[in-house]
Swiss-Prot record:
Name of protein: Zinc import ATP-binding protein ZnuC
Organism listed in the record: Chelativorans sp. (strain BNC1)
Region (Disordered): 264-283
Enzyme class label: translocase
Residues annotated to bind ATP: 45-52
Record family assignment: Belongs to the ABC transporter superfamily. Zinc importer (TC 3.A.1.15.5) family.
UniProt catalytic activity: Zn(2+)(out) + ATP(in) + H2O(in) = Zn(2+)(in) + ADP(in) + phosphate(in) + H(+)(in)
Feature: compositional bias, Gly residues: 272-283
Function recorded in the entry: Part of the ABC transporter complex ZnuABC involved in zinc import. Responsible for energy coupling to the transport system.
């Protein structure tokens, strides 16, 4: 088989110039994004930047009003939502949580709980779980469906820093073991997974993209968070060659002001030392 054919077969989702228009405005526009099997792509950006809209287009919940989205035939998606509506006053075990959205094979449930590191909590009430344990339960529920693409919407919300490290490490291990693609929304603009292959910064459009840089392994950092933290979390240095004004217009690097930067080219810095406009963020 030709190499190009193999590469095309590995593509799970491909978006080209995709956008969603609602109530007279673009929620997000001009999105080019590809997720391949075994690849981790992380979306970052402020609230309202179009991260969730982009994910919904990727998995087919929303159809693009312009551009195109192509998915692998019979693509299986495992989805961990940002919020789950649960009546916390009712008794609900982790096992029952796993089957809330459909019947699952008991063996697959057990394997998924084992993979998420919470097999010992199968009969525990969800009300008693910590933030990290609950996120692992949601992750296990997605894994039980043996997805080709794992979609994680802010998977470390409500989790302390140590828990973030453990969850990101788990996500990386799941990718390595199953070969699934991962599309992840990060709640933090500055700290992303070191294992991420591509970081895409959104603000109604793609501002910039690149690979994350590992957190500096200073003695102080290792002392505070442990040696593994530097291998799991990374700082993504990026720069913008334009400025978003309060009225929604955009000031370009040469001083000209335009209505939007949809068609404007954005330089991407893979190294924080490139370009005078680079900003280093340290979580």
């Amino acid at each position: 088989m030709l190499q190009t054919a193999r590469q095309d077969q590995e593509v799970l989702v491909e978006m080209r110039n995709a956008g969603v228009h609602r109530s007279g405005r673009w929620l997000v526009r001009g999105v080019d994004l590809t997720v391949r099997r075994g690849e981790i792509v992380t979306l970052i950006g402020p609230n309202g930047s179009g991260k969730s809209t982009t994910v919904k287009m990727a998995i087919g919940v929303l159809q693009p009003d312009e551009g195109a989205v192509r998915r692998m035939p019979s693509l299986k998606v495992g989805y961990v939502p940002q919020k789950v509506s649960i009546d916390w006053t009712l008794p609900l075990s982790v096992e029952r949580l796993m089957a809330l959205t459909g019947t699952l094979d008991r063996k697959k449930v057990g394997e998924a709980l084992e993979a998420a590191g919470i097999a010992h909590l199968a009969r525990a009430e969800v009300q008693t779980l910590s933030g990290g344990e609950f996120q692992r339960a949601l992750l296990a529920r997605a894994l039980a469906r043996e997805p080709d693409l794992l979609v994680l919407d802010e998977p470390v919300q409500g989790v302390d820093f140590t828990g973030e490290i453990a969850l990101y490490q788990l996500i990386s291990e799941i990718r390595d073991r199953t070969g699934c693609g991962v599309l992840l929304i990060s709640h933090d603009l500055h700290v992303v997974m070191a294992a991420t292959d591509t970081v895409i910064c959104l603000n109604g459009h793609i501002c910039c993209r690149g690979t994350p840089e590992k957190v500096l392994k200073s003695p102080e950092y290792v002392r505070l968070f442990g040696a593994r933290a530097g291998d799991t979390l990374a700082i993504y240095h990026h720069h913008h060659d334009h400025t978003h004004l309060a009225d929604g217009r955009v000031r370009q690097a040469d001083g000209t002001i335009v209505d939007d930067c949809h068609a404007h080219h954005h330089d991407h810095a893979r190294d924080g030392g490139q370009g005078g406009g680079g900003h280093g963020h340290a979580g």
